[in-house]
Amino acid sequence: MASFVTEVLAHSGRLEKEDLGTRISRLTRRVEEIKGEVCNMISKKYSEFLPSMQSAQGLITQVDKLSEDIDLLKSRIESEVRRDLHVSTGEFTDLKQQLERDSVVLSLLKQLQEFSTAIEEYNCALTEKKYVTGAQRLEEAQKCLKLLKSRKCFDLKILKSLSMELTIQKQNILYHLGEEWQKLIVWKFPPSKDTSSLESYLQTELHLYTEQSHKEEKTPMPPISSVLLAFSVLGELHSKLKSFGQMLLKYILRPLASCPSLHAVIESQPNIVIIRFESIMTNLEYPSPSEVFTKIRLVLEVLQKQLLDLPLDTDLENEKTSTVPLAEMLGDMIWEDLSECLIKNCLVYSIPTNSSKLQQYEEIIQSTEEFENALKEMRFLKGDTTDLLKYARNINSHFANKKCQDVIVAARNLMTSEIHNTVKIIPDSKINVPELPTPDEDNKLEVQKVSNTQYHEVMNLEPENTLDQHSFSLPTCRISESVKKLMELAYQTLLEATTSSDQCAVQLFYSVRNIFHLFHDVVPTYHKENLQKLPQLAAIHHNNCMYIAHHLLTLGHQFRLRLAPILCDGTATFVDLVPGFRRLGTECFLAQMRAQKGELLERLSSARNFSNMDDEENYSAASKAVRQVLHQLKRLGIVWQDVLPVNIYCKAMGTLLNTAISEVIGKITALEDISTEDGDRLYSLCKTVMDEGPQVFAPLSEESKNKKYQEEVPVYVPKWMPFKELMMMLQASLQEIGDRWADGKGPLAAAFSSSEVKALIRALFQNTERRAAALAKIK
């Protein structure tokens, strides 16, 4: 081959075209032969896996020599073509194109050579645990393979074998790197599956090895740096750090942020640093932000020193790796979750519950700033302000939100508590809240000055007849203890609003309004069944609603001049809620009254219309019905005793007794025939009602004070006097009936109509001339 090239180069003058074509053909055949041998060798090595190292080296030498010959011949041809272009341009061009095709084939063979060399060097580096060098050789082989794939004329079967070989070797080095990583970063967990208990935290450890156990003699950098840099070269560093970051967050950082008694302990030993936990007793229910920041800083500083502060920007054979610091990479991966954890488990619980403590929160804001600055110095964070600091600085909004949330939660708990636990309200009762702050001193002096002037100018403007001091007070009654606490909560919240910022004051004010809206919706629904079945609870609920409505009348006015200016233009009012609460209480009590009326009428329906009282069975049924009615009324009187205000109590009992009496009157006046015995027995039943009826009026627990209301029965029972007249008629003669009618002017005429009186006379007396005369007088 060398003599052939020498002969071509030594030839002087014009080359013979036939001779040149023959030589190029020979060269082409030789290229094809070498190509076949190389492909055969590659196929055997990467597809058939046969040892062929010596033949491969010989082929490499032949390829190099042949490449040099082609370059010399190509140069000579170009020279001859330029000299004799006008003679045989087309022929020389064809020869040149054929030669260029041969050059392409040779370049592909060179790429195969470089691929094979890179794989061989990779294997050597992997054997010597030079992971960075091995990773770089794999990347070189990857580039060679990519270039080969870009040539469509190459054998696809060989490319497939090479690609598979490259994949296998990459997974191989990643496996070895993973093993080295597990030796350098060792997690120790408790045997139990529960990893969220304090006991499991105390058994969790992280071991950071600064050197490998089998230290190599010639290592260009610390082993952990070598492993990380190799991961970086292979493009796997991000996923490896992300996995480490998630475990760090789950097993180290989150427990420190959520458990106040947990503290990190750093143990330094030869070639190893251990991060573990210890428990220190504390009375804190939630961790202090400043303490949590200190704990996390300690852990991150250790990681920064032992793991994250390693150079990844070294140029190795012109192969530049990532210049982003490891700390910043890890920070980007876990900071969002870490800051959310710090907010939910730490900062949220540090928000004050009282506006007077807001000033103390500046310390927490300052510690948050210091924490973030420390992380920025470690390059764990970038320069931008994070959500953590924004959350801490937005304390006014968070305080208002938390306060409002706490108020609503407390209010709802009170609304869903038992209604029957009551307290007595008297006209002098007051809400247990601190005194409201006085208005501005200047305004106070001005008011006093005007008042003194008017006092001296006008001697006495007080009217002769004054109202009672309790005219506008809520009457004595019993309300639920929970409702009293609910009103105290409303007053305390508004009092808090008077010393808060404008934004917070507005939120607190509307939270108080929301309390009453919530009461309107929750209580009737939550206690629906009891309010329907138990008359005492219905009465208490009625009082509760009236009590709230009573306070809502003046609640806004009391705080009007002390709230934020935006609320002082008339919006700070609760008067619009008053009708709704009055209606709520009234409807509930009226529904109970309707239920009681229904029971009374149902009992009286078993009296067999009070007819044929001479029949013992009928009389017994009527007597039983009357006694059941009286018993029901007495039981209601006891249930409502000392609960309802006296006037409401008397009206309610009077209405129910009036219903029963009206039914009795209606049944008796509807009878067509009443014998003497019937009349006597009906009179006896009516007398029972007349004697025991007033006893149901017992609004007060002291029996001596109830006599007044029992004597006023006719005031509350409209049918009481007609009932007495009915009793009189059952025992009276025709003459007595006529006298009480008194030409339509007597008490009987006031109680019954003429038709009703006539019907009773016809039922009571036989048809005689005297009866006819008596009927004639009834007009």
Swiss-Prot record:
Residue ranges of region Interaction with RINT1? Answer: 2-317
Where is it mostly found? cytoplasm
**What Pfam families has UniProt attached to this entry?**
ZW10_C, ZW10_C2, Zw10_middle, Zw10_N
Cellular location(s): Cytoplasm; Endoplasmic reticulum membrane; Chromosome, Centromere, Kinetochore; Cytoplasm, Cytoskeleton, Spindle
Is Transferase set as a keyword in this record?
A: no
Instruction: Give the way it sits in the membrane.
Output: Peripheral membrane protein
List every position bearing Phosphoserine.
3, 12
> Which ranges form a coiled coil?
14-130
Question: What are the GO cellular component annotations?
Answer: cytosol; Dsl1/NZR complex; endoplasmic reticulum; endoplasmic reticulum membrane; kinetochore; kinetochore microtubule; lipid droplet; membrane
Tree of life domain? Eukaryota
Tell me, in a sentence or two, what this protein's role is: Essential component of the mitotic checkpoint, which prevents cells from prematurely exiting mitosis. Required for the assembly of the dynein-dynactin and MAD1-MAD2 complexes onto kinetochores. Its function related to the spindle assembly machinery is proposed to depend on its association in the mitotic RZZ complex. Involved in regulation of membrane traffic between the Golgi and the endoplasmic reticulum (ER); the function is proposed to depend on its association in the interphase NRZ complex which is believed to play a role in SNARE assembly at the ER.
- Family matches, as PANTHER family: CENTROMERE/KINETOCHORE PROTEIN ZW10, CENTROMERE_KINETOCHORE PROTEIN ZW10 HOMOLOG
Q: What name is this protein filed under?
A: Centromere/kinetochore protein zw10 homolog
Q: Name its species.
A: Homo sapiens (Human)
Its gene is ZW10
